[in-house]
Design a protein with these regions (language model features):
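Solvent-exposed alpha-helices and their adjacent loops that cap or buttress functional pockets
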Residues: 1-3, 35-36, 121-125, 152-155
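Conserved beta-strand elements of the Class I
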Residues: 9, 41-43, 128-130, 159-161
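A general structural signal for well-ordered secondary-structure junctions
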Residues: 39, 101-102, 156-159
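A short aromatic-anchored loop/beta-hairpin motif
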Residues: 2-100
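Short, well-ordered beta-to-alpha junction loops that form the rim of enzyme active sites
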Residues: 46-48, 108, 162-164
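Internal, conserved structured core segments that host functional sites
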Residues: 89-144, 149
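A contiguous pocket-lining binding segment that forms or flanks enzyme active sites
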Residues: 143-164
């Protein structure tokens, strides 16, 4: 348990090439990671996981997804071997009841919208990382309510996502 509550961070990842680069963005991400209290887990809401429904990754070892094309081979070799946490996934699902979220044990993982930033914020990749999908068919109000239901987790889970 951390000593002070964590708030959500809204971080646009920009180019996946930021994973390999040192620039003003990646330096700020590293500084953020050094300044944050250590969370129990990280939950990222990723626009790259855009489905008809809401799901949270619930595997112990989420795969790293290279969901892009046209970049150098070195980027496709990038890895962020963070663990997952089915237990934290269940806590998230419980917070979103009734009926908001399903557990995803094997169809997704950690996409570049998450790992390209976390490679700098938490470079050791030793914190459980979970992703929450974006419900492509739900109205704006649904997503606001989702955020309200996630709010009580702020003292246990760092959350990240971006909305433009």
């Amino acid at each position: 348990m951390i000593s002070s509550p964590l708030r959500s961070a809204f971080i646009g990842h920009g180019s996946p090439m930021n994973t390999l680069e040192s620039n003003r963005f990646t330096r700020q991400w590293r500084a953020l990671g050094q300044a944050l209290p250590r969370p129990r887990a990280v939950l990222c809401i990723s626009a790259h996981w855009f489905i008809h429904g809401t799901a949270v990754t619930a595997m112990r070892h989420p795969p790293v997804i290279h969901d892009f094309f046209g970049f150098p081979g070195e980027l496709f070799e990038s890895d962020y071997p963070a663990p997952g946490s089915p237990e934290v996934a269940q806590e998230i699902a419980d917070a979103l009841k009734p009926g908001y979220v399903g557990l995803d044990p094997d169809s997704w993982g950690i996409d570049h919208g998450t790992w390209s930033v976390l490679a700098h914020v938490f470079p050791a990749a030793d914190l459980p990382v979970l992703q929450l999908s974006v419900h492509g068919a739900a109205p704006f109000e649904y997503h606001l309510e989702l955020g309200r239901r996630l709010a009580p987790l702020h003292d246990r889970v760092a959350r990240s996502g971006a909305s433009i």
